[in-house]
C-alpha cells in the first residue's frame, strides 16, 4: 500500500499499471498549459482534416435540427398533452441529440454543433479564427438543410405549427428573452469548458469519455427552463435554420436575440472559465 501511495503522490508516471482509477496520470505541478491556437492558420486550408471536421459539423447540425424540429412539430400539433411527449420530451430530444452527436464528432471536429460554443472556444484561443469561421458556416448550412428536410415532406404541418422557429413568447419582453438566452448559453458553454478542460483531462483519464454526458444534460436542463420563454435558442445555427425555412415575419422580429444572447453568454463563460476558474492570465510564465 505504501508503494501505491507513493506512486500516486509522484503522479504515477512510471507506474501506470498500478494507478487507481481516477487518479492523476500527471501531477498538477508537472502540468503545462497547451499553447494558444494561432489567430490565423492558413496551413489548415490545405489539410483534409480541416475539411473533414467541417463536414462533421455540417452533418451533426443537420441531424440535430432534423430530429429536434420533428419532435417540436409532434408536440405542437397535438391537441392533448397526454398524447405527446410535452416540453419534457422536447428537452430530452435536444439534450439527447447533443449527447449523441458530441460523442460521435468530438474526435473529429471537437463536437461543437453550435456557433456560440465555437465562438467561446475561439475567445479562449482553443481554435483559430480560420477554423472558427469555417465551423460556423458549416453549422448554419447544416441547420438550414435539416429544417428544410422536415419542411420538405411535412410542409403543411411545418408551416401551420411555427416551423420550430424561436420567438419571444407572449407575456415576456425582449429583455426577458435576451436574458434567458444569455444565461442559458452561459450554462452550456461553461459546461463545455469544464467537461473538456485539458488540465482535468490530464489528471483524470475517464473525463474525456464522459464529456458528452454533462454537455447534453446541460442542454436538457436549459430547455426545461427556457422553452416557455423563447422556445430555447442557445444555438444561433438552430435559430437561423428554422427561421430561414419557416420564413414568416414574426420569426424574424426577435431573431437578433438568438445571436446576441448566445454570443454574450459564450463570451462571459469563456472569461469566467479562463480568468476566474483557471486564472490563466495570472500564472507565471518562464
Curated annotation (Swiss-Prot):
Gene3D superfamilies: Glycerol uptake facilitator protein. Aquaporins contain two tandem repeats each containing three membrane-spanning domains and a pore-forming loop with the signature motif Asn-Pro-Ala (NPA). A motif (NPA 1) lies at residues 114-116. Expressed in leaves, roots, stems, flowers and fruits, with highest levels in roots. Can be used to improve resistance to abiotic stresses such as cold, drought and salt. Keywords: Abscisic acid signaling pathway, Cell membrane, Membrane, Stress response, Transmembrane, Transmembrane helix, Transport. Induction: Induced by salt (NaCl) and water deprivation. Repressed by chilling treatment. Seems to be regulated by several transcription factor genes, including MaERF14, MaDREB1G, MaMYB1R1, MaERF1/39, MabZIP53 and MaMYB22 under salt or cold stresses. Residues 76-88, 153-174, 230-256 are extracellular. It is a multi-pass membrane protein. Water channel required to facilitate the transport of water across cell membrane; mercury-insensitive. Promotes primary root elongation and root hair formation. Contributes to the tolerance to multiple abiotic stresses including salt (NaCl), cold and water deprivation, by modulating cytosolic K(+)/Na(+) ratio, maintaining osmotic balance, and reducing membrane injury (e.g. oxidative injury). Also regulates the expression of abscisic acid (ABA)-responsive genes during dehydration and salt stresses. A motif (NPA 2) lies at residues 235-237. SUPFAM superfamilies: Aquaporin-like. NCBIfam families: MIP. Residues 1-54, 110-131, 196-208, 278-286 are cytoplasmic. Residues 1-34 are annotated as: Disordered. It comes from Musa acuminata (Banana). GO terms for cellular component: plasma membrane. Belongs to the MIP/aquaporin (TC 1.A.8) family. PIP (TC 1.A.8.11) subfamily. InterPro entries: Aquaporin-like (IPR023271), Aquaporin_transptr (IPR034294), MIP (IPR000425), MIP_CS (IPR022357). It comes from the Eukaryota. GO terms for biological process: abscisic acid-activated signaling pathway; positive regulation of response to salt stress; primary root development; regulation of response to water deprivation; response to cold; response to osmotic stress; response to salt; response to salt stress. This is Aquaporin PIP1-1. CDD domains: MIP. The chain crosses the membrane at residues 55-75, 89-109, 132-152, 175-195, 209-229, 257-277. Its main location: membrane. GO terms for molecular function: channel activity. It is found in: Cell membrane.
Amino acid at each position: 500500500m505504501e508503494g501505491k501511495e507513493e506512486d500516486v503522490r509522484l503522479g504515477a508516471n512510471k507506474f501506470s499499471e498500478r494507478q487507481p482509477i481516477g487518479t492523476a496520470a500527471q501531477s498538477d505541478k508537472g502540468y503545462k498549459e497547451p499553447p494558444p491556437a494561432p489567430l490565423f492558420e492558413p496551413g489548415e486550408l490545405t489539410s483534409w482534416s480541416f475539411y473533414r471536421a467541417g463536414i462533421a459539423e455540417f452533418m451533426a447540425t443537420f441531424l440535430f435540427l432534423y430530429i429536434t424540429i420533428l419532435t417540436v412539430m409532434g408536440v405542437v400539433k397535438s391537441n392533448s398533452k397526454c398524447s405527446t411527449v410535452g416540453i419534457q420530451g422536447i428537452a430530452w430530444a435536444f439534450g439527447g441529440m447533443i449527447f449523441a452527436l458530441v460523442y460521435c464528432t468530438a474526435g473529429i471536429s471537437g463536437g461543437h454543433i453550435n456557433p456560440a460554443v465555437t465562438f467561446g472556444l475561439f475567445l479562449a484561443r482553443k481554435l483559430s479564427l480560420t477554423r472558427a469561421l469555417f465551423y460556423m458556416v458549416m453549422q448554419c448550412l447544416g441547420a438550414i438543410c435539416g429544417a428544410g428536410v422536415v419542411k420538405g415532406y411535412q410542409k403543411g404541418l411545418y408551416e401551420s405549427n411555427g416551423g420550430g422557429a424561436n420567438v419571444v413568447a407572449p407575456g415576456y419582453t425582449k429583455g426577458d428573452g435576451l436574458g434567458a438566452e444569455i444565461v442559458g448559453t452561459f450554462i452550456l458553454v461553461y459546461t463545455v469548458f469544464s467537461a473538456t478542460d485539458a488540465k482535468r483531462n490530464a489528471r483524470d483519464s475517464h473525463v474525456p469519455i464522459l464529456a458528452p454526458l454533462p454537455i447534453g444534460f446541460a442542454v436538457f436542463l436549459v430547455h426545461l427552463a427556457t422553452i416557455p420563454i423563447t422556445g430555447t435558442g442557445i444555438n444561433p445555427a438552430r435559430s437561423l435554420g428554422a427561421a430561414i425555412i419557416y420564413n414568416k415575419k414574426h420569426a424574424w422580429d426577435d431573431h437578433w436575440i438568438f445571436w446576441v444572447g448566445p454570443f454574450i453568454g459564450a463570451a462571459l463563460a469563456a472569461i469566467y472559465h479562463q480568468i476566474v476558474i483557471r486564472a490563466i492570465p495570472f500564472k507565471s510564465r518562464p
